[in-house]
Regions:
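Flavin-dependent oxidoreductases
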Residues: 8-160, 174, 180-183
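A conserved beta-strand/loop element that lines the FAD pocket in flavoprotein oxidoreductases
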Residues: 1-6
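C-terminal catalytic lobe of FAD-dependent flavoproteins
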Residues: 139, 143-148, 157-257
């Protein structure tokens, strides 16, 4: 919504971007910072950057893979009381992550859901609607250029959580904490979740391209990346960050994964 970026204007004697093309006109610039989450692919394509990555394996050989892979991030809310997870000290708990190899049975039907490794996370919903969380995402089985990112999230007609997610996540909650047993019917049905645009190794890329374009491809780690803004700003001004250095694009060809 608002101004739409349609492309980039480049200098005649260099690869540097001199302007950002939008549906409202061209915005001249000296530096460009792209931090677009699931839309990283679109800006990458506009900048005409490579659609594949060459990765040096442990065997010393080069392997070619797609630059991007879309994952469907499955999330939901179970409508328990806002203080359902309150700790003994009266405070709300942190985000809880659980990975398990124990067989998982349905809280509703008691049938086996999976006997393979599974994982969930959950926390109090920030809007007080209950407990919010999700399971492991699944890979979208399409070439990244054929994935419809828009309309995004709850507006997407194609990418939504399913009844199978509902049963699995609520059952996993009951498996982890007895207080969730018999609460599956409180799951708030409705559109949720969204697409994530993943790099070849599912770790972020923080790097400069085309001389003056700084790409923050956070691999949809979201709020966990909230501290990078200051580090990126310092890099643009000439101070390299030791924290961001391992996440350069050339790590793939170097095999430094």
């Amino acid at each position: 919504k608002g101004v739409t970026v349609t492309g980039f204007k480049k200098g005649s004697n260099s690869k540097a971007v001199t302007g950002v093309e939008t549906d409202k006109g061209v915005i001249d610039c000296e530096q460009v910072v792209v931090g677009a989450g699931p839309w990283a692919r679109d800006f990458w394509n506009m900048l005409e950057l490579p659609k594949t990555a060459n990765i040096k394996g442990k065997d010393g050989k080069m392997h070619t893979t797609d630059m991007w892979t879309y994952w469907m991030l499955q999330e939901g809310v179970i409508g328990v009381e806002p203080d359902f997870l309150k700790m003994d000290n009266g405070k709300q708990p942190p985000v809880i992550h659980v990975d398990s190899t124990a067989p998982l049975y349905s809280d509703k039907t008691k049938k086996l859901i999976t006997d393979k490794i599974w994982g969930i996370y959950y926390k109090p919903d920030i809007e007080g609607l209950g407990v919010q969380g999700g399971t492991s995402p699944y890979i979208v089985d399409k070439h990244f250029d054929k994935v419809n990112v828009d309309p995004y999230g709850i507006d997407s007609p194609e990418f939504q959580t399913t009844e199978a997610f509902n049963d699995m996540w609520c059952s996993a909650l009951a498996h982890c904490q007895k207080r969730f047993e018999g609460k599956s019917d409180l799951y708030r049905k409705g559109p949720s979740g969204g697409l994530g645009c993943m790099t070849p190794d599912s770790f972020p890329i923080f790097d400069r391209f085309l001389e003056n374009v700084y790409m923050i491809a956070d691999a949809n780690h979201g709020y966990k990346m909230i501290g990078v803004g200051e580090l990126v700003a310092k890099e643009i001004l000439g101070t390299e960050s030791d924290l961001l250095k391992p996440f350069r694009f050339n790590r793939y060809e170097k095999g430094e994964l």
